[in-house]
Amino acid sequence: MYEYTLNFERMEQAIGLFGNFDENMRIIENEYGVSVVNRGNSMKICGEPEKVSLAAKAVEGLVMLLNKGEQLNEQNVRYCISLVNEGADDRIPSLASDCICITMSGKPVKPKTLGQKKYVDTIKNNTIVFGVGPAGTGKTYLAVAMAVKAFRAKEVTRIILTRPAVEAGEKLGFLPGDLQQKVDPYLRPLYDALFDMLGADNFQKCQEKGSIEVAPLAYMRGRTLDDSFIILDEAQNTTPEQMKMFLTRLGFNSKIVVTGDITQIDLPDGKKSGLKEAVKILKDIPDIVTVRFTEKDVVRHRLVQDIIKAYEKYGEKNIKPKK
């Protein structure tokens, strides 16, 4: 049996580290099979030497985040554990990030993974950014947050959000309703992100003034967009022609963020994805950068990753070999 002791400089450290009902330390205990004891101004970790060493690294990293003003929760505790398990515990302090903006409910919007932090920093420092990766990695939400931040700081005068109105198994011409009613469901995720950060009333006022626009990609044709923060979502469903059209809308003092998941292409068979092609064609141009997310950047409920892994495992078992 091996013991590790950590002394706290302030009681607030212990309170923040352990969390409500010691939930953060329960996660550490379950992950490493150790025992964590709270002794007020100190704590002890007991167990096998190797497991205690890993748990101690995780705890020390979490204390560093607390000292930088971060609040701990299940999500960042589990992410810190994953970094420790990969031997990347020295990168934990870099998770502490400045707040991008505050939602209407008072919640700070911050990057939650190293991949997200790289994405936000890349958007800050470049004119055109491609964010490519699986669903749940915060590609669109963080891009909208950066757009709202730039708009509030008067760095741009407009926010423009767009996506192609192409989804699996549905054709707009066969859906009931007028054009606005038809395209609204496809744009709903963009509306939701803006409502979250601006509130429905403020969003509506900005939309009426023309300072915020949410529209299908086809509406971008023939325009030059100056002083704008422009986001193209679900870009894997653009054709090469649409992508070229969109990117060449860039005007002076504007920024473009393009997001998509190249594993979820809903284009008809035989159609190339404009996103896949653009990333290849533009990779050597300065001020155009691609950030790639992985499943480690998924920030949804922890069960989502378990569900994805279970389906992948099931799929591998049930793939019939070709004769």
What are these regions (language model features)?
Residues 1-16:
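Short glycine-/aliphatic-rich beta-strand segments at the starts of folded cytosolic domains
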Residues 37-96:
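Interdomain "pre-motor" coupling segment immediately N-terminal to P-loop NTPase/helicase cores
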